[in-house]
């Protein structure tokens, strides 16, 4: 899709859904101006990129992850590494959607990275509900929005999926009005429960994905931490505190464990290594290639909670 078509599509989606936004500076209502910018009544204005995304970041905070990490994660996702997770999340959202009196729901992926997870979910939701394939409209259609603090990651996300609203934003102060979303996804990303609860509808759902004890165990072992082949551990990981924190703040509906082995083709291995912070500052390329690694463990916990 050309840059002109991307910005036109993004403009259409944002214009139809401008009421979900609040000004990240003053909190005022926002509207889309003719010159492709989202503005409030006080004159604060945020440009819509010709690449099809909004930059609503007001602070100078530098993103933690590099563009290379997100490019690699996109390739890993395209290879099907997270497909069982995407299927499970789609099922959770579809179940919620089916019980909702609305004909369409609003979904936010908070900390969406390069957008692979949300893109996969939106595509599968359209397959389940063909009548809702025209997304991001006010009148009864599904609305999918992805945000991340990394401009690089959002640029990558906007390359692939024109029917999702993509925004650069900070989780510490989300640029959305109270009660704007029915479902908030938080996938392998830091959380801000106060903001999530604020932007969720009265009985909205927070779906948080956290790593399990054996997530990427082979990589953790290779770089000096995690479970060894014989079962002993050098440095174990537990998500117990994260789960407890979730349970204290949300009305827990379900806890789902997802575990499987993924066969890694040789050409995918460098991208798998680069997509995780576990390998920062490590000679992981050499370590993994020397061990002839071909199977990687995926161990995830999906926490589903309702807004209290």
Regions found by a protein language model. Name each.
Residues 162-174:
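Conserved SAM-binding strand-loop segment of SAM-dependent methyltransferases
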Residues 2-63:
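N-terminal auxiliary segments of SAM/dcSAM-dependent transferases
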Residues 17-18, 258-308:
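Conserved Class I S-adenosyl-L-methionine
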Residues 114-132, 136-138:
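Conserved SAM-binding loop of SAM-dependent methyltransferases across substrates and taxa
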Residues 102-113:
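Conserved class I S-adenosyl-L-methionine
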Residues 11, 63-88, 92, 96:
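Class I SAM-dependent methyltransferase Rossmann-like catalytic core
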Residues 172-183:
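A short acidic, Gly/Pro-enriched loop at the edge of an enzyme's catalytic core
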Residues 204-214:
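Conserved beta-strand signature within the Rossmann-like core of class I S-adenosyl-L-methionine
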